[in-house]
């Protein structure tokens, strides 16, 4: 039977532990243990912090509402600071010492891929919050994810470029795991959309100036547009440099910068006209009244912004969907055992989240298609839908 997202239906009770040690109080009923390792600090904190805040906020709401099948959840969270070795260590600790029945996390592709062999060997269901397609292709029995893949992002961007007849483009990709993976995916499918890559440059995550790479791309014969692929501060630096060089070409970014923080860091003037694929969450108030994602996205946005005083981001939305997917699976499994939760999770049908409507299967551990992405443009420092 199709599952319609409802906060009231999936609320549960929980105690929280955050950071590198448990803060939760013990309880005889705190017997459903869900673990999380997130990059709440370090270079990926702009991703991991809203994820951690979202999980805490939601379990607080869950605490107030009354439980999954009359049992409590204890959420145990560690901060891996974006370090793959720490993520692997924490995943092992969550399973062996904390005895969790499921794990949410892996903020980045690098930390996620360090966690994957641990959960697969232990047989513990894991929902990743990372973007790269390699997380779920090939399909692994216990590994799922909520963000759209980098390959999907390439396809969505190339569809828009094709419509605008921007067929000769340059790439500027980060050398981090996300940037490298998305670069590979874009190179693989460009020809399917009639796109020719006439320039291919890279940047390191800590680079403070990308003028040389952008100048090289600007001077490529016939170039019509530039696509930046990356996470963190790098894409913002590239966007500022782009404006400083007054490059008269449309600029595209990836879903890796789909948050207000990108606009704030790069500046509203520099980001004017930038396009990228994003989730419904960024334009929640602009969605049609009949859009099934509108009530989910607007409710989360209002709750998160009210609780934190910060703008809701796509990344927090990934955590929102992951937690609710896991809670729904536990309810349907009717028992908090890893194998039962995994089977129920894989049988999810019609779950409406901030990223889209999710239908999972033995051959698809993401459950989203390209229509779940929205092409967005920044105008006057705000996100708007591209018609």
Locate the predicted segments by residue.
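Sec/Tat signal peptide C-region and signal peptidase I cleavage site
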Residues: 23-30
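Beta-alpha junction/loop-to-helix N-cap segments that form part of ligand/metal-binding clefts
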Residues: 33, 46-53, 65-137, 146, ...
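Extracytoplasmic "Venus flytrap"
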Residues: 35-56, 78-85, 107-108, 172-180, ...
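Extracellular/periplasmic periplasmic-binding protein-like sensory domains
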Residues: 239-318, 382-385
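Bacterial N-terminal signal peptides that target proteins for export
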Residues: 2-15
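Extracellular/periplasmic Venus flytrap/periplasmic-binding protein
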Residues: 89, 133-135, 141-246, 290-291, ...
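Periplasmic-binding protein-like
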Residues: 94, 98-107, 127-129, 170-173, ...
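Segments of small-molecule ligand-sensing domains
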Residues: 303-316, 325-383
């Amino acid at each position: 039977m199709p599952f319609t997202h409802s906060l009231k239906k999936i609320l549960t009770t929980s105690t929280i532990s955050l950071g590198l040690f448990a803060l939760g109080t013990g309880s005889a009923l705190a017997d459903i243990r869900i673990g999380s390792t997130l990059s709440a600090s370090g270079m990926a904190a702009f991703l991991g912090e809203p994820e951690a805040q979202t999980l805490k906020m939601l379990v607080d709401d869950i605490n107030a509402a009354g439980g999954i099948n009359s049992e409590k959840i204890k959420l145990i969270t560690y901060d891996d600071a974006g370090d793959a070795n720490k993520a692997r260590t924490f995943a092992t600790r969550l399973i062996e010492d904390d005895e969790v029945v499921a794990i949410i996390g892996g903020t980045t592709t690098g930390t996620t891929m360090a966690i994957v062999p641990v959960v697969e060997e232990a047989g513990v269901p894991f929902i990743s919050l990372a973007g790269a397609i390699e997380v779920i292709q090939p399909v692994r029995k216990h590994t799922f994810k909520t963000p759209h893949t980098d390959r999907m992002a390439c396809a969505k961007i190339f569809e828009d470029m094709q419509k605008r007849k921007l067929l000769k483009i340059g790439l500027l990709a980060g050398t981090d795991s996300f940037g490298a993976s998305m670069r590979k995916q874009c190179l693989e499918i460009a020809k399917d959309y009639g796109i020719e890559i006439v320039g291919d440059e890279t940047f390191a995550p800590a680079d403070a100036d990308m003028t040389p790479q952008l100048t090289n791309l600007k001077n490529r014969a016939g170039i019509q547009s530039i696509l930046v692929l990356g996470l963190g501060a790098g894409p913002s630096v590239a966007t500022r440099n782009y404006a400083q060089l007054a490059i008269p070409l449309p600029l595209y970014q990836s879903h890796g910068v789909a948050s207000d923080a990108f606009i704030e860091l790069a500046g509203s003037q520099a980001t004017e006209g930038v396009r990228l694929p994003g989730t419904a969450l960024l334009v929640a108030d602009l969605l049609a009244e009949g859009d099934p994602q509108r009530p989910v996205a607007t409710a989360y946005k209002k709750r998160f912004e009210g609780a934190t005083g910060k703008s809701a981001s796509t990344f927090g939305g990934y955590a929102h969907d992951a937690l609710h997917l896991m809670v729904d699976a536990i309810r349907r499994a009717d028992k908090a055992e890893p194998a039962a939760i995994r089977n129920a999770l894989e049988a999810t049908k019609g779950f409406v989240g901030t990223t889209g409507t999710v239908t999972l299967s033995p051959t698809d551990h993401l459950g989203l298609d390209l229509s779940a992405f929205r092409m967005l443009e920044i105008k006057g420092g705000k996100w708007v839908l591209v018609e």
